[in-house]
């Protein structure tokens, strides 16, 4: 019939439309797409269109087609889940440190009732803060703020720029910015540097220890308004952190670039890496299974050395040399800042990049290595600590405290910007804005102030009004029905 023919045409055109969309989409591949996912999507499109066309033909049994539809749904879910879920550890490993971490966390809670963040020096899973029950910075959630995730990535955190970022021992500047007060480490995981952390608790069986940040800042503090010029662009995370510190305090040079004393290639050739930045290299054939790049760096002053490595092809890096007892290794597929420990001026650290797994004949690596100027950092920290919020009360949706400010300043927080957050200074609502495209910030004048931060989910008032109206409407309808029945019974 003409109607059936129209249905067939619509289904064919819709199927062709989706097929065209997939073909166009594969021209703009993202990190979440692959050639296999494109082919599987096309295959499912063809199968779904075929099933829908079969449903229009009377010759096919509806029960058989219904079973086929259910089977298709399950197949699609199985294919999707199997390709996206990666099991990295067994159940026993998953919970092996639970008792140790819980003892340490309970010791912290007993010692300190203030508002702060705690972290592990090595996270076994993205959601360790939820699993172990502590207030951390790490998260992996569909509700995470993408701008905040991007900022964390730009600051040198392990993450995906979208909805996940994971803490690894960071610089004192980062720990100060993001309210990190305690770190917990097991004997097999990295120990925080004693230059900035003090051990305050050790489990009875020595299964874990707690370290307190000597340069802790509360959730909010006053900083110079020059921060309006802060550009938190992706690239060199030390520049992003250093610019924040400079603009917030007026002190420059908290990070000092390391010197580069040597660059050598084994079974590769490439640029000479002589300073922080990006350098290119290549191998004679993509079939070559061996090749290394070795860069030697040397701090220009005493202090902790931090390094950040990124490459689209290199997966692992190793660090050895003066002051490093055992060779350190790092997976740089997802780059993040690594603390190489305290080193004296002139010591040499060898950075070895394994290029054996390169699938291309040419690639590049970005390397940024810095040491800390402890004197500059200490001065800047004291400036910010003197104008930090003294938290007096806090809960799930509010933080209250007092602050003393010397000059017109920004009231900076490590809270993700959300229009649901309201800031009240001395009872008056202040205008909030984004800092670094992600952080909740407002302005504050000189003097002593009472500050209150309140959170109300966006749309709560409208949602409550709509729900209340609906409830009232249903109640009114039921009352009218009840009255009408009464009248009918009386009339009868």
Please annotate each region the language model reported.
Residues 20-31:
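Juxtamembrane "helix-exit" motif on the non-cytosolic side of transmembrane helices
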Residues 30-31, 215-222, 448-452:
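Short, charged/polar, Gly/Pro-enriched secondary-structure boundary elements
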């Amino acid at each position: 019939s003409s109607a059936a023919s129209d249905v067939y045409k619509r289904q064919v055109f819709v199927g062709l439309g989706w097929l065209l969309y997939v073909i166009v989409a594969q021209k703009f591949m993202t990190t979440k797409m692959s050639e296999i996912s494109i082919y599987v999507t096309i295959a499912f499109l063809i199968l779904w269109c075929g099933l829908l066309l079969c449903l229009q033909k009377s010759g096919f049994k509806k029960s058989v087609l219904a079973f086929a539809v259910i089977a298709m749904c399950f197949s699609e879910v199985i294919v999707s889940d199997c390709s996206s879920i990666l099991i990295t550890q067994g159940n026993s490993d998953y919970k092996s440190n639970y008792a140790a971490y819980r003892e340490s966390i309970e010791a912290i809670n007993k010692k300190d009732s203030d508002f702060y963040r705690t972290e592990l020096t090595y996270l076994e899973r993205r959601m360790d803060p939820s699993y172990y029950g502590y207030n951390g910075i790490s998260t992996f959630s569909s509700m995470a703020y993408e701008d905040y995730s991007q900022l964390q990535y730009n600051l040198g955190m392990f993450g995906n720029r979208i909805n996940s970022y994971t803490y690894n021992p960071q610089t004192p500047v980062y720990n100060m910015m993001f309210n990190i007060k305690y770190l917990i480490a097991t004997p097999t995981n990295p120990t925080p540097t004693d230059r900035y952390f003090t051990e305050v608790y050790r489990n009875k069986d020595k299964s874990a220890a707690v370290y307190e940040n000597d340069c802790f800042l509360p959730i909010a503090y006053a900083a110079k308004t020059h921060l309006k010029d802060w550009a938190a662009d992706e690239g060199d995370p030390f520049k992003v952190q250093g610019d924040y510190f400079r603009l917030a305090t007026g002190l420059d040079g908290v990070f000092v670039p390391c010197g580069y004393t040597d660059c050598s290639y084994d079974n590769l050739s490439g640029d000479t890496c002589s300073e922080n930045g990006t350098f290119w290299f290549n191998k004679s054939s993509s079939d070559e299974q061996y090749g290394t790049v070795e860069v030697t760096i040397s701090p220009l002053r005493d202090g902790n050395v931090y390094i950040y490595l990124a490459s689209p092809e290199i997966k692992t890096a190793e660090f050895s040399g003066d002051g490093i007892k055992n060779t350190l290794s790092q997976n740089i597929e997802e780059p993040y800042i690594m603390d190489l420990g305290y080193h004296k001026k002139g010591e040499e650290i060898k950075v070895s990049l394994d290029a054996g797994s390169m699938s291309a004949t040419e690639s590049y690596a970005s390397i940024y290595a810095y040491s800390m100027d402890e004197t500059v950092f200490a001065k800047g920290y004291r400036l910010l600590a003197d104008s930090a919020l003294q938290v007096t009360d806090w809960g799930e949706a509010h933080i209250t405290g007092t602050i003393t400010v010397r000059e017109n300043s920004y009231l900076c927080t490590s809270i993700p910007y959300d229009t649901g957050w309201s800031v009240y200074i001395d009872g008056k609502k202040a205008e909030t804005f984004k800092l670094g495209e992600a952080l909740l910030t407002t302005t504050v004048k000189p003097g002593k102030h009472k500050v209150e931060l309140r959170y109300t989910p966006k749309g709560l008032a409208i949602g409550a009004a709509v729900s209340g109206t609906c409830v009232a409407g249903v109640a009114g309808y039921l009352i009218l029905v009840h009255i009408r029945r009464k009248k009918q019974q009386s009339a009868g």
